[in-house]
């Protein structure tokens, strides 16, 4: 049996995953990286994208992440993500409604701060929608 990788996925709210897996593919800032046990130590920022967790005999887990860092050490892989949501939890119709509301919030913004905040929310929702 192949050696397993210790993998922890942490968001500001909670520990989302902690366990041993066969491989994790992360959306690094310089491109996707497949991480397995014994990988050379590396640190990378994350771009918005999908983390794929592979484990023999189990369905592949796919998790959207927006920003954060990944660190590979001899002990394993730790991902500190700014925002995460399992792809299975996303609903295209609901996201389309939220995008329409966010568009309205941008148009209705009364000052630059509110407009910037609304634009960030809109961009975030569009990134999520692109993954569904």
UniProtKB/Swiss-Prot annotation:
Subcellular location, principal: membrane
Protein name: ATP synthase epsilon chain
Membrane topology of the entry: Peripheral membrane protein
Record InterPro entries: ATP_synth_F1_dsu/esu, ATP_synth_F1_dsu/esu_N, ATPsynth_dsu/esu_N
Keyword Signal found: no
Gene Ontology cellular component list: plasma membrane; proton-transporting ATP synthase complex
Record's keyword annotation contains Signal: no
Cell compartment(s), UniProt: Cell inner membrane
Quaternary organization: F-type ATPases have 2 components, CF(1) - the catalytic core - and CF(0) - the membrane proton channel. CF(1) has five subunits: alpha(3), beta(3), gamma(1), delta(1), epsilon(1). CF(0) has three main subunits: a, b and c.
Function: Produces ATP from ADP in the presence of a proton gradient across the membrane.
Species the sequence originates in: Parvibaculum lavamentivorans (strain DS-1 / DSM 13023 / NCIMB 13966)
HAMAP family: ATP_synth_epsil_bac
SUPFAM superfamilies: Epsilon subunit of F1F0-ATP synthase N-terminal domain
MF terms in GO: ATP binding; proton-transporting ATP synthase activity, rotational mechanism
Lineage start: Bacteria, Pseudomonadati, Pseudomonadota, Alphaproteobacteria, Hyphomicrobiales
Pfam families according to UniProt: ATP-synt_DE_N
Keyword terms: ATP synthesis, Cell inner membrane, Cell membrane, CF(1), Hydrogen ion transport, Ion transport, Membrane, Transport
